[in-house]
């Protein structure tokens, strides 16, 4: 069972009574056939549920109103099978607060050249019925997604499935609670921001809990539960000599397990699915949570360090979006560069907290090493290299009057040398189009040093996310040129300034 099993998408057919009951009967039959086929064959992430035909303003308004109040409904897919006068949709679309996709399709793929008549033409009017619907969306300044293609086309299936992931993620985000253990890292700007504005825009709430509250739960974990979890560590990871039974750092592993169990219990009891920590606020914890955070991220929790609640929420959102897809998604930080002509590289990592979902296939190493930051006992962590291939890094920043999503397309590469003295998980990549352009563009656009790194999602996914939440997106990829990029930032400033 995945998070998508908690939601459904409603399939709504637009028509009218002008064509008579026989035409509406055929429309209903076609709709039932298409929905059944899509649910059976299209490999969609969640179920399509066919709703009654929308043939009058009252019927359409009722469907939209019901969608708003049904928590299982993640969004609407609308098919204009015949011509459906768009003024009938105004009241419904005015109140609709769920994502909307217009499936611009028709029941038949090929025209029946020898038998086509006006009855056929009146029944299969997507070509201009869809345009009428598109006009009212543009007139109402309501942007919605559009997918064109026959309902049996695999590319159309993939695009609908991708949109469904966004719709479910948006609905889930409305219930997302972010827990900050402690506050923001002192004096850091980009990790701060307006939590009220974020809740208005995205729906997630952000609140702080004292580390002492967490410590109470951690200390309540039984030794039996700790030992059982450490047994799991033994089977899942390659333990260094220091972390094995009778090893000099074995107690640190036991404490890390206790912290993991305590954090998970605290998060479950509070209904949290994202959280932050900061090394400046660890009072009562014996070590900075490293292993615990890594494993919780792998289980689907959002996380970011230093109180960075925006990145923690974004990671959770992207975890939901990518559920079931190949590749992982993790908290990340651009840490240091390798400058070499024609082979500039970025080494990404964090103090400890990189998600094992992006790791290469061999078992991660579980080790305990000294950490100079935080002033606590040496923390346990998983050490691994990252899978290679195309990926993205994304950053969500608060500009005061709006949110900006930055996305850099990257190519993850194999680490060319061993890193015997670097005891943390890491990722190595080439930034597109090149490191000077990518880094300068990122800095000019105000991108954070914390990002969400993903092999599972791509630029199109993030474009859909930005459109669905009506936020600015700034893209850095192989097509980026700095003069045009700077112009786009200036144009966006004017555009969003007019919208205030």
Swiss-Prot record:
<dbReference type="Pfam" id="PF02610">
    <property type="entry name" value="AraA_N"/>
</dbReference>
<dbReference type="InterPro" id="IPR004216">
    <property type="entry name" value="Fuc/Ara_isomerase_C"/>
</dbReference>
<dbReference type="GO" id="GO:0030145">
    <property type="term" value="F:manganese ion binding"/>
</dbReference>
<keyword id="KW-0119">Carbohydrate metabolism</keyword>
<keyword id="KW-0054">Arabinose catabolism</keyword>
<dbReference type="InterPro" id="IPR038583">
    <property type="entry name" value="AraA_N_sf"/>
</dbReference>
<feature type="binding site">
    <location>
        <position position="450"/>
    </location>
    <ligand>
        <name>Mn(2+)</name>
    </ligand>
</feature>
<protein>
    <recommendedName>
        <fullName>L-arabinose isomerase</fullName>
        <ecNumber>5.3.1.4</ecNumber>
    </recommendedName>
</protein>
<feature type="binding site">
    <location>
        <position position="333"/>
    </location>
    <ligand>
        <name>Mn(2+)</name>
    </ligand>
</feature>
<comment type="pathway">
    <text>Carbohydrate degradation; L-arabinose degradation via L-ribulose; D-xylulose 5-phosphate from L-arabinose (bacterial route): step 1/3.</text>
</comment>
<feature type="binding site">
    <location>
        <position position="350"/>
    </location>
    <ligand>
        <name>Mn(2+)</name>
    </ligand>
</feature>
<dbReference type="InterPro" id="IPR009015">
    <property type="entry name" value="Fucose_isomerase_N/cen_sf"/>
</dbReference>
<feature type="binding site">
    <location>
        <position position="306"/>
    </location>
    <ligand>
        <name>Mn(2+)</name>
    </ligand>
</feature>
<dbReference type="InterPro" id="IPR055390">
    <property type="entry name" value="AraA_central"/>
</dbReference>
<dbReference type="GO" id="GO:0008733">
    <property type="term" value="F:L-arabinose isomerase activity"/>
</dbReference>
<dbReference type="GO" id="GO:0019569">
    <property type="term" value="P:L-arabinose catabolic process to xylulose 5-phosphate"/>
</dbReference>
<keyword id="KW-0464">Manganese</keyword>
<dbReference type="InterPro" id="IPR024664">
    <property type="entry name" value="Ara_Isoase_C"/>
</dbReference>
<dbReference type="InterPro" id="IPR055389">
    <property type="entry name" value="AraA_N"/>
</dbReference>
<keyword id="KW-0479">Metal-binding</keyword>
<dbReference type="GO" id="GO:0005829">
    <property type="term" value="C:cytosol"/>
</dbReference>
<dbReference type="Pfam" id="PF24856">
    <property type="entry name" value="AraA_central"/>
</dbReference>
<comment type="function">
    <text>Catalyzes the conversion of L-arabinose to L-ribulose.</text>
</comment>
<comment type="subunit">
    <text>Homohexamer.</text>
</comment>
<dbReference type="InterPro" id="IPR003762">
    <property type="entry name" value="Lara_isomerase"/>
</dbReference>
<dbReference type="Pfam" id="PF11762">
    <property type="entry name" value="Arabinose_Iso_C"/>
</dbReference>
<keyword id="KW-0413">Isomerase</keyword>
<comment type="similarity">
    <text>Belongs to the arabinose isomerase family.</text>
</comment>
